[in-house]
Amino acid sequence: MENIITATIFGSVILLAAAALGTAIGFSLLGGKFLESSARQPELAASLQTKMFIVAGLLDAISMIAVGIALLFIFANPFIGLLN
């Protein structure tokens, strides 16, 4: 049982780290491409900014889903029920 709890905690940590790393890389790419495109065509900056914030919200939702799954695995571990 201790092995399952330990593996679940390690899996949750890896899940959170991957979500944080992916979100950070995604935000940096999104911001860089937004600055590049708004510098190339300044008249589209307002339209691009709106779309950038929508995509940033969707990108942030991915990490929030990962946090929810990790909290599920840590506090309500479904794998412990398989032992009985």
Swiss-Prot record:
The regions listed as transmembrane in this protein's record are: 9-29, 54-74
Sorted alphabetically, the keyword list is: ATP synthesis, Cell inner membrane, Cell membrane, CF(0), Hydrogen ion transport, Ion transport, Lipid-binding, Membrane, Transmembrane, Transmembrane helix, Transport
InterPro entries per the UniProt record, alphabetical: ATP_synth_csu_bac/chlpt, ATP_synth_F0_csu, ATP_synth_F0_csu_DDCD_BS, ATP_synth_F0_csu_sf, ATPase_proteolipid_c-like_dom, F/V-ATP_Csub_sf
What GO molecular function annotation could you give as one example from this UniProt entry?
lipid binding
Q: Where in the cell is it found?
A: Cell inner membrane
Q: Matching Pfam families, A to Z?
A: ATP-synt_C
Q: Per its UniProt entry, which superkingdom is the organism in?
A: Bacteria
**SUPFAM superfamilies, alphabetically?**
F1F0 ATP synthase subunit C
Say where the protein is mainly found: membrane
Which function does this protein serve? F(1)F(0) ATP synthase produces ATP from ADP in the presence of a proton or sodium gradient. F-type ATPases consist of two structural domains, F(1) containing the extramembraneous catalytic core and F(0) containing the membrane proton channel, linked together by a central stalk and a peripheral stalk. During catalysis, ATP synthesis in the catalytic domain of F(1) is coupled via a rotary mechanism of the central stalk subunits to proton translocation.
Q: What is this protein called?
A: ATP synthase subunit c
Source organism per UniProt = Histophilus somni (strain 2336)
